[in-house]
Amino acid sequence: MENGDVMKAELYPDIAPNTVNNFISLVKKGFYDEVIFHRVIKGFMIQGGDPQGIGIGGPGYSIKGEFAQNGFKNDLAHTPGVLSMARSMMPDSAGSQFFIMHKAAPHLDGAYAAFGKVIEGLDIVDKIANVPTDYNDKPRVEQKMKTVTVDTFGVDY
């Protein structure tokens, strides 16, 4: 984070292979660097990945949604720290925006492509979830990802 806070997550290519591949590709391009968490709802989730910072931006393409309601086996529950792809009402509309669960939201299970989990820095998710927001759930003080990196442990993506 811009303030020096660090979150680390593990990704699950066995659960959502295309989603993980897309996320890693965007990370490697520096797509998420200097991007804010533009939507923050305490007790629910924090959302980022829009380079415009307003909730409508993306990479210029969308990917197939890897979740049960869209014909994919994905049993990763939306519990605290889980990463999942944000999308519109259309199941195959995710691109770059993702959210990190602040609290459990079982109503999202099977309806959104969960693909990873925060393994270090869950307190940072909590900290971001507790910042004051405006009427659009946008933090009054930017919560910016300074640099997002990935370690694939020798696996090519």
Question: What do these predicted regions represent?
Answer:
Residues 1-157:
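Cyclophilin-like peptidyl-prolyl cis-trans isomerases
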